[in-house]
Amino acid sequence: MKVGVLSFQGGVIEHLNQIRALGHTGVEVKKEKDLDDIDAIILPGGESTTIGKLLKITGLIKSLKEKIESGLPTWGTCAGMILLANEVEGQEEKYLQLMDIKVKRNAFGTQIDSFKTHKVIEKISKDEMELVFIRAPYITEVKDNVRILCKVDDKIVAARQDNIIVTSFHPELTNDVTFLNYFLKSKWMK
């Protein structure tokens, strides 16, 4: 399987390393032609406004949105969640707007408030997973067509809608590939 990782900033190398560790091909996506022949894409963490601006400057935003709308399996982590959200609290700038969620940026606090926790996400695995939150957003509202996958402190931190999964946390910053494996083995995959 060929998995693209949007490669403007964030945990690009970490995502690529985990993809390759599972025996798949990981490719960097920086321009429109990089979207050709990928089976799935990951939108990593980073600074969402910077990534959003780069998507617009490069012209990648339109073709990426079309690919995702046509069913490309997509996983957004942290900033990726913000890019995919239909609405971001206190932010007028819109990006992909492909998931029926409302998100609060930096909702858990600043860089100094970043934290790790452990949790069993029953819809993903019976085993406890380490969840790493770095200036993380969380979801404040979901429409009925969105399936909540995980909450931490009563805050929605993982969800799924059709071919899109989002997480507030960064599984790529751990040695645990459980969440990536779940994404790649989901029923939408070829």
From Swiss-Prot:
Gene: pdxT
Full protein name: Pyridoxal 5'-phosphate synthase subunit PdxT
Reported function: Catalyzes the hydrolysis of glutamine to glutamate and ammonia as part of the biosynthesis of pyridoxal 5'-phosphate. The resulting ammonia molecule is channeled to the active site of PdxS.
Keyword Acetylation assigned: no
Organism of derivation: Clostridium beijerinckii (strain ATCC 51743 / NCIMB 8052)
HAMAP family hit by this protein: PdxT (MF_01615)
GO molecular function annotations of the record: glutaminase activity; pyridoxal 5'-phosphate synthase (glutamine hydrolysing) activity
Subunit structure: In the presence of PdxS, forms a dodecamer of heterodimers. Only shows activity in the heterodimer.
UniProt xrefs under PROSITE patterns: PDXT_SNO_1, PDXT_SNO_2
